[in-house]
Amino acid sequence: MGKKNTRNTKGRIIQAAWRLFYQQGYDDTTVEEIIAESGTSRGSFYHYFEGKDALLSTVSYLFD
């Protein structure tokens, strides 16, 4: 059950970031907005990503 939750949480963060980056642009999107959109916590965000730049690298790789 832990692995499924892990993938779910990370996936929700990535999907939320993609939506917000697309709608608002990378520079105008904050980590707080990504956290709110994904329904996760600040701790979860930083557990998976060092910051917004690291998240952008993942989003770019997955959606390229």
Where do the model's predicted regions map?
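Basic, helix-initiating cap at the start of DNA-binding domains
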Residues: 1-24, 28-40, 54
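Alpha-helical DNA-contacting segments of helix-turn-helix folds
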Residues: 49, 56-63
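Nucleotide phosphate-binding site architecture
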Residues: 27, 46, 61
